[in-house]
Regions:
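Bacterial N-terminal signal peptides that target proteins for export
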Residues: 1-9
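Metal-cofactor-binding active-site regions of metalloenzymes
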Residues: 25-558
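Membrane-interface motif at the C-terminal end of an N-terminal transmembrane signal
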Residues: 19-25
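Bacterial N-terminal signal peptides
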Residues: 8-19
Length: 558
């Protein structure tokens, strides 16, 4: 049967890649519908045209991004030159001065470069990122990705505010409004305490097969041991590092605000991007050190959450007023396939189970399921995500790539949907590290099972991408519609760790707003007094209202 004539006319008048003008017959439709037609027309015009459309599409939040991995290689090289650091041409890494041969002063890689200096500069950018990487026998994308951090790392915090500014500026340019940055605060004191006072449950005494679900690690008796160990660490002064950890964030935020001229008439657009922090715990250390660092993380986050004074570690860059704690949650990081990470996985989830009972208000997001067949034995693919949800109390899962290898995967998907456990989807990272892409990725399976998902970049500097790139990739690879993209953006803020109630009456159901804000245009400039009072009392709802305002502004263009 031939399509109706008006559809043929609309097709003939379809949007051009240059202007994205909506067909005349669609201009009387609702703004959402007009934007959807423009989106489809841009898709038909090809990836470059769709990139233009998606660049200014409101994206809400970026929830899975490591600060060190978010910075582009060029920034690290420039800062190394400013700091008088050296370059090791053989290792393609930065080094401390003096720059005696074979080391080369990083300053030689700025200004007018000789051909040799340009070649070294290019090799450094490649070594600090996935640019141009081609896997070879014995050196995979996984190896390249994680080796980059050793090459540009260990440089102190002098430029931390510049790194946050780089992330916020990029976010503002592509219409993001909120970012949760993962960062590892200092924990040398906690690590030393753990080394001098090892945890009684030493998993190194167990056999190497201890990553299986029936592992003897972390049995019920460990809970009492954790309680005793927690108190011992407190008695030995574990809390002494908390002020320094919070000051690190405060100083970075202050430097960022200065760079962006926030609060002045010259304020940069990045000032409007809210930034919060997730406390990274390194999972590749012995049990006592992991527990001590996690314990310090929970204490630091709780202290930040409890802080109500103007010297709180969190300043929203736009006006400098204290809004909410700098640290809003905790995450476990480092390669999940590492020996200790695999051996101690259940034990570490038991640690989180105990610490959650002591600090129930601290938010938890966990890297889990960043694994693929062949990377570890099959037994290692069968329980990480489930244990992160059920033992680790994860509200969000980072990656979740091996979910269909989990024992009773359909049941796990149902459980995640029922509990509204969101999955942070990192498409480019998963391809680069695990070689998983397209139909092999579980992204569409999560969506089909009604598990909430949102897009994120993981390490946009290392991967040489941005969040728009991930939206473009998802749109093309999985044939997403315009309203699918809106749901992804809304889901990101719905599952952010911002304080307060959601704008929406039911979790992950973006149809009916909370009672206080019903019967009025969402995202309007003048919410009712009752709605305004509700928004003023909830950071999350206020951010969600702003997202709806941005949708209205974006869709009004079509």
């Amino acid at each position: 049967m031939r399509p109706p004539a008006f559809l043929l006319v609309c097709a003939a008048l379809a949007v051009t890649a240059a202007s994205f003008q909506v067909p005349v017959c669609a201009q009387t439709a609702l703004p959402d519908a007009r934007a959807a037609r423009a989106y489809q027309a841009a898709r038909q015009a090809g990836a470059p045209a769709l990139r233009v459309f998606l660049d200014q599409f409101p994206k809400g939040a970026e929830l899975h991004i490591h600060l060190s991995g978010a910075v582009y290689a060029e920034s690290f090289i420039r800062e190394a030159s400013e700091d008088g650091l050296c370059v090791n041409p053989a290792a393609l890494s930065l080094a401390q001065p003096p720059c005696a041969a074979p080391l080369v002063p990083a300053a030689q890689l700025s200004g007018s470069l000789t051909p040799a200096a340009q070649r070294l500069y290019d090799r450094l950018v490649d070594a600090f990122s996935m640019r141009g990487f081609v896997a070879t026998s014995g050196f995979s994308g996984h190896d390249q990705f994680f080796s980059t951090f050793d090459r540009f790392g260990g440089r102190g915090q002098r430029h931390a505010g510049e790194w946050v500014d780089e992330v916020a500026s990029r976010a503002a340019a592509e219409n993001e409004q909120y970012v949760e940055l993962m960062e590892t605060p200092a924990f040398a004191h906690a690590a030393r305490l753990a080394q001098e006072n090892p945890l009684g449950l030493d998993s190194s005494r167990q056999q190497d097969s201890s990553w299986q679900q029936d592992s003897p690690l972390g049995q019920d008796s460990s809970r009492e041991e954790f309680a005793r160990y927690r108190q011992r660490l407190l008695d030995l002064g574990l809390r002494e590092e908390i002020p320094a950890d919070r000051e690190k964030v405060r100083a970075a935020e202050a430097q960022r605000r200065q760079i962006e001229h926030c609060g002045s008439s010259q304020a940069a657009p990045a000032c409007q991007v809210q930034v919060r922090y997730l406390y990274q715990v390194l999972r590749g250390f012995p049990p006592g050190q992991v527990f001590a660092q996690a314990r310090l993380g929970f204490e630091t986050i709780q202290a930040s959450m409890d802080a109500a004074s103007p010297d709180s570690t969190s300043l929203d860059a736009a006006d400098g007023k204290a809004r909410a704690p700098g640290f809003v949650g905790l995450n476990f990081v480092q390669p999940e396939d590492g020996f200790i990470a695999m051996r101690d996985y259940t034990l570490q989830m038991k640690m989180l189970d105990y610490l959650h009972s002591v600090y129930p208000k601290v938010h938890i997001s966990l890297h889990a399921g960043e694994l693929a067949s062949g990377l570890v034995p099959p037994e290692g693919l069968r329980f990480h995500i489930r244990q992160a949800v059920e033992l680790g109390h994860a509200e969000r899962i980072g990656h979740g790539v091996d979910v269909m290898n989990e024992q009773d995967a359909p049941g796990l998907l149902r459980e995640m949907a029922q509990r509204h456990v969101m999955v942070e989807i990192n498409l480019s990272s998963n391809e680069g590290i695990l070689g998983v892409k397209g139909a092999e990725h579980p992204f569409p399976l999560y969506r089909a099972a009604h598990v909430p998902v949102a897009l994120s970049t993981d390490d946009e500097g290392v991967s040489r991408i941005d969040l728009t790139h991930e939206y473009l990739r998802a749109a093309l690879d999985y044939r997403l519609g315009y309203r699918d993209l809106k749901q992804l953006a809304r889901t990101s803020l719905e599952h952010s760790f911002l304080a307060g109630a959601s704008l929406w009456a039911a979790t992950d159901s973006f149809t009916t707003p909370a009672a206080a804000c019903q019967a009025q245009p969402l995202g309007g400039d003048k919410p009712s007094p009752r709605c305004k009072s509700f928004l003023d009392g909830s950071e999350k709802a206020a951010a969600q209202w702003e997202l709806e305002r941005r949708f209205r502004a974006f869709e009004a263009k079509f």
